[in-house]
Amino acid sequence: AWGSNLDWGFNKHPPMSAFFTEVFFKIFGSNDWAYYLLSQIFVLIAFYYVFKLANLILGNIKLSLISVLLLESIYFYNFTSPEFNVNICQLPFWSLVVYYSWKIYKSKEIEFIDCFLAGVFAAIGFLSKYLFIYLLISIGLLFIYLIFIKKIKKFDFKYLITLEVFIVLLVPHIIWLYNNEFVTIEYGLKRTGIEETNLIDHIKHPIIFLIKQIGVLIPFFFLIWI
């Protein structure tokens, strides 16, 4: 419903999940099956680029397929995947950003298109869910470590293409946030319980979260073991 009033941001989430659902609404109307299909399309795109990434790294189609099957065993790629939401929306862009980042890292001659696409998909991923920034920070720190500390790679100004594209695509959303008193960020911070004064809760809830994450990864660990 909120996708019908497209904007550069919303009270709870950045705009991309609303944008994609609105596109499907314009094509298929309010048929439930269309949104289940949309969700599975996003999951399949994620699997496809995980397969391509694994094949780049391993050079073996069989092992690359096994990589996808292992990913499929993770709770967030199976049981929760029928419902299209911000978590599903970001999945293909995780795979795409990692895939193009790997291509940039391994290429002897860095291609403009790889840097450009990495920036585009990074922006779309971030505009799907803010927590996408964790992946971007991790990749950025890794490149900084490899280039400036380990000196395995030489700095190339083409790296900045990715950053420039990312920032340019975020500008409309940043303007929207400013004009709306950063309501989306405020909502996210409230959900973290940052105002909670009970110190025990700040210890208890992370432990509970960790236990749950270990639980949902049990099938994945089991398949690796066998």
Where in this protein do the model-derived segments appear?
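Hydrophobic alpha-helical transmembrane segments
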Residues: 19, 37, 64-69, 115-116, ...
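Transmembrane-helix motifs of polytopic, lipid-linked glycan transferases
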Residues: 37-58, 95-100
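Transmembrane-lumen/periplasm boundary regions of multi-pass, lipid-linked membrane glycan transferases
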Residues: 124, 135-226
